[in-house]
Amino acid sequence: MLSALLALPAATWATAGPEGADGGARLSICYNYGCASEGSVHVRGPTLRRIGERLAAARNAAEERERLAGAVGGLYRVAATQTAVAADRAGNLLDGGADGRMDCIDHSTSTTRLLQLLEARGALRFHRVVEPARRTRLILQHFSAVIEVLSVAERIDRLPPGQALAGCNCTEDGLVIGGIGEADGDDRPGQRYVVDSWFVDNGEPAVVLPLAEWLNGGGPNVQ
């Protein structure tokens, strides 16, 4: 089911509806476990612009991930004003069968859609959105949205026209684009991280972890 849901084109998930005149976007959020229910959510243009401005202030991939965790939480708060997902709590046991509860399929599907919306709006400069990941422990399995660190060349490609040259420090060694080639600590192009909103209550920042750590069981101890 998850692969079928994610096979839909991004435009199906994040297109401007009748209210799109404000620069906003409309997308579907899954809930009630296994994407049994879906609710249409309109994110206003000013909200998307504020999120974009905050993400644009990130100086490297690590800072973008930190800001992205909060952005995902904020978008779920928006969804909570228009759908039943305000009832969602961390994990599954605390949901108590409430309408609006979300399991990991709901979260991985919906969070991927939220991330793709931000990516389509040019808000991600250091990462791309990739397919969700699955981990299996004994008879249990768990899914999460995933992002991947971009190379410097790919980051430059994402700059608006003219911005790369405007920020260029031209030297004999080549081009250094301000804010694009800064050191990212241990980050390497292609490195993957989960953005897992299942671990938290509705509206709280998502948990962002290296994919390898998550696959090994990393993350808060919730059920």
Give the label of every model feature segment.
Residues 1-9:
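Bacterial N-terminal signal peptides
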Residues 12-61:
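N-terminal accessory/pre-domain segments preceding catalytic cores
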Residues 28, 33, 102, 166-168:
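Extracellular secreted precursors and ectodomains with disulfide-bonded cysteine-rich loops/domains
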Residues 37-38, 54-65, 93-106:
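Second-shell loop/turn segments in exported
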Residues 38-45, 112-115, 177-178:
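Extracellular/mature segments of secreted proteins
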Residues 70-127:
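Mid-length scaffold segments of soluble, non-membrane domains
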Residues 116-206, 212:
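Hydrophobic/aromatic-rich core segments of domains that either
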Residues 215-223:
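Glycine-rich, aromatic-bearing surface loops/beta-hairpins
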